[in-house]
Amino acid sequence: MIKRLLSFLDASPVNFLAVKNISEELEKNGFRRMNPQEPLGKIEAGEKFFVTKNDSSIYAFQIGKKPLADAGFHMICAHCDSPTFRIKPNAEMLCEGGIVKLNTEVYGGPIMSTWFDRPLTLAGRVIVKGENAMSPQTLLLHVKRPLLQISNLAIHFNRQVNDGVKLSKQKDVLPILGIINDELEKGNLLMNVITDELNIQKEDVLDFDLYLADATPACTFGVHDEFISSGRLDDLSMCWAGVEAMIAADANDTTQVLAIFDNEETGSQTKQGAGSPFLSYMLQRIALAQSHTEEAYYQAVERAFMISADNAHAWHPNYSEKFDPTNHPKLGGGPVIKFNAAQKYASDAVSAAIFANICDAAGVPCQRFVNHSDVAGGSTLGNILASSIPLKGVDMGNAILAMHSCRETGSVIDHEYCVKAFTKFYQL
């Protein structure tokens, strides 16, 4: 099981590739790709299908034996984006000695220092000419070799570096791409990489969404190989747990939904984010296809339950003072239910009890997380989604260290626990 997760992480350096890989895995397991531009048609019990939005979010459905109005739906949601650096247009910056660095902007909230002095690569999508102006073609790019690096300033020029350094997002985190060898490469070094990798012509390239990614493969470590080290555990590990559970669960009375959104790290307010009405539209279309009445959708929502799956903070042995004294989850302790008095999480006593029951039925331990009262925490998908679909639900996630680092640390057994809990949820 863990090898499949590591392979998925390595093959999914950005949201677009994560959605591609999830799509292919679903298709291999009997799910049919549907075009949301076309009518759904008749919806049969047991039918399995998925749709995508913007090539960066994906929504999978296994239709229950009972109509949505009668049995509701069980939904797991997660997000496939992670903090990184986006390549700006006109990105090449020529420096002395022919060195070319790339102009970038920060995406989300990365721990920027963790991106220094490690091999990086490029991944994303490239838009090329299509049949007409309104239908350009999308090509996915993943340079599968070390290509760039952000280098630190030597300690000899900054003796206070170990006392803390304030980093400029515009100046200090620009990656080195290469050295120009001849005049023809001037201004074309990045474009040459793109066209060579995709075997296309420069004049066909219209635009791109490209991002930096860690070029080092995901791995396990520890005396017993009990830990996972990888970029993007937040939140691809939860995405993949949802995929594994959706594939493993057989059809039952309740419709099963897996929603993997984009842009959680920047607020979710996009057409492919949790703040979009797209998922609501899809559920309404399914309900209407089954019962031909709008009332069916509203009944389904009242019978539904959502698991919002986004990683939680594991207790850190070097920084124990940052954690709540009685609610600090450990690596290897099972899925974590997240609470917040300011309602940043969807969890309440009822939904938490339901999720704890699910874990118990799956033979899985679970933990609880509350922020230290003097330390502000983040928010996640649950309440954003609930603002458009008023679902009963719980915010949870597996505990990890170094959230938003270029490489995060998780637990092997926690991933196995999570897949078991998610599978049991879909089977109820």
What label would you give each PLM region?
Residues 1-428:
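N-terminal hydrophobic/helix-forming segments and targeting peptides
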